[in-house]
Regions:
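A structural signal for multi-pass alpha-helical bundles of membrane permease subunits
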Residues: 2-285
Length: 285
């Protein structure tokens, strides 16, 4: 490796470290703020909270660490746990439904040939690219006709038929060598057995990657529950933080940290499969 290459490699690593610090800063900000007392937060963020005119400042080591905000969230906020279990129900219901619908759909697109296959898959891609604001009205009217508004099913039902997990899993299933499938057919394996014993084991990377991504998406729903739910007892955890009053900064920090933990655990548990899923997103026909 010549001198120019070493310098370029060093600059690249330095740039990546700087980016990592920038992206980690909000997490460190939340974590340290959650252990600060209200007086210290007011002193540091007085200008942001409208209590002072000087510039805001921040200390990464709390002067007087306290667990007060965590105790308040975990022991004095029953509505937090109601919303937490609402989020669990929504996420688990959506993921189970997606496994039931998306895995066979992705396998069908990847393995079988049928009329209008490319056109139908192209339609899937178009729907996947549409933001929620485009489909919001149609979803609302359908859910109203089905009498699902103001229920957790109004969040679960549209998510079950999401096209995104189909797209992720399709790219993994498509990577299975056709010779393997043909050999199984020659040996007398039924199509269902091929799907269960070859497709799912070899495509588990795509399945797990899509489940991780969908967990992160539905754990952080904002617009859908605000649109489809009027009963606040049905709200998911993602709407708890916006409902906190501005002066309860420490409480908001603690809520943010606790809410972040499940998402972080899921991400780190499936990050290897997630990397494989992102690498497989190139569409080939």
């Amino acid at each position: 490796m010549n001198r120019k290459s070493r310098i370029l490699k060093m600059l690249t690593k330095t740039g990546l470290v700087v980016l990592a610090i920038v992206f980690c800063y909000p997490v460190l900000f939340l974590l340290t703020g959650s252990f600060m007392g209200q007086s210290e937060l007011s002193e540091n963020l007085g200008s942001v909270m409208g209590e002072a005119t000087r510039y805001a400042r921040w200390n990464f080591l709390p002067q007087n660490p306290t667990l007060k905000h965590y105790i308040e969230v975990l022991l004095d906020s029953p509505e937090y746990f109601v919303m937490f279990w609402n989020s669990i129900k929504v996420v688990m219901g959506t993921l189970v439904g997606q496994c039931t619908i998306a895995i066979p759909a992705a396998w069908g697109f990847a393995v079988y040939k049928f009329k209008f296959k490319k056109s139908l898959f192209f339609l899937y891609i178009i729907i996947m690219m549409m933001p929620f604001q485009v489909t919001m009205l149609s979803n609302y009217l359908i859910l109203k006709q089905l009498k699902l508004l103001d229920t957790l099913a109004s969040l679960i039902f549209p998510g079950i038929f999401s096209t995104f997990p189909v797209f992720i899993m399709f790219n993994f299933f498509r990577g299975i060598p056709p010779a393997v499938i043909e050999a199984a057919r020659i040996d007398g394996a039924r199509e269902w057995d091929i799907f269960l014993k070859i497709g799912i084991p070899l495509g588990k990377g795509g399945i797990i990657a899509s489940l991780v991504l969908e967990f992160l998406e539905y754990w952080n729903l904002i617009e859908q529950p605000m649109t489809f739910l009027n009963d606040k007892t049905k709200w998911p955890l993602s709407l708890f933080l916006p409902a906190i009053r501005g002066e309860n900064v420490g409480f908001a920090f603690a809520v943010s940290v606790i809410t972040l933990i499940p998402a972080a655990l899921v991400f780190f548990a499936g990050h290897e499969y997630l990397e494989q899923g992102i690498a497989s997103l190139g569409v080939k026909e």
